[in-house]
């Protein structure tokens, strides 16, 4: 039976084994998918051991996505732009890295939530690896503009410089934001700790679609903040998790699973 796994630290909380198990059952693919906690200083060795032992593919989660980018022999174009890798497989004995996070986000927003991004004013909150990983796929949708807001403005300016050739991208401090925006995407993990960045109320209106890339059993702090300010359409990142997993599954197996029943099952299970 073909072996796959997710590698992270910590990783015991990961929903990936359940998601890929549901994909395998649905598609009739014969595989086993587990979770592997790699030592913080032993990621490369963990990956090498997995593939030497006959493993077929790995998902990579926090905090190893940047390390994964560095150890591969080849990268997809989107992984190259993202500076991070979340999916590994071997091709002709060489380690290949891809990044399906941005595809997962865009598919969840555009397909599952039915929100078109073309021509929209988008606010991206945060300027870390999660935001960098989704910038190119968001720009591919043809928004009117993307504003990146971050506590450390220089980090947002770095992203604006890197991706500005692909569309209209600007950097702002939170205090300098003017709105409202059509779409606000939170790419920080702060809301899981009950915290949100100091966003002015002017950025949001009733028509604003708000999306938290994080997810939890209850509303994240960001989703609660958006609802309290009258946003009619708010969403967490569980759909992104399922969609990026489906993209990885397709890369490995050549079969694209139906994500709707898997997402519904996870929502009910939660």
Curated annotation (Swiss-Prot):
Catalytic activity: shikimate + NADP(+) = 3-dehydroshikimate + NADPH + H(+)
Keywords recorded for this protein, A-Z: Amino-acid biosynthesis, Aromatic amino acid biosynthesis, NADP, Oxidoreductase
The keyword NADP belongs to this UniProt entry's keyword annotation: yes
Residues reported to bind NADP(+): 126-130, 150-155, 213, 237
Any Pfam family matching the protein: SDH_C
Subunit: Homodimer.
Official protein name in the record: Shikimate dehydrogenase (NADP(+))
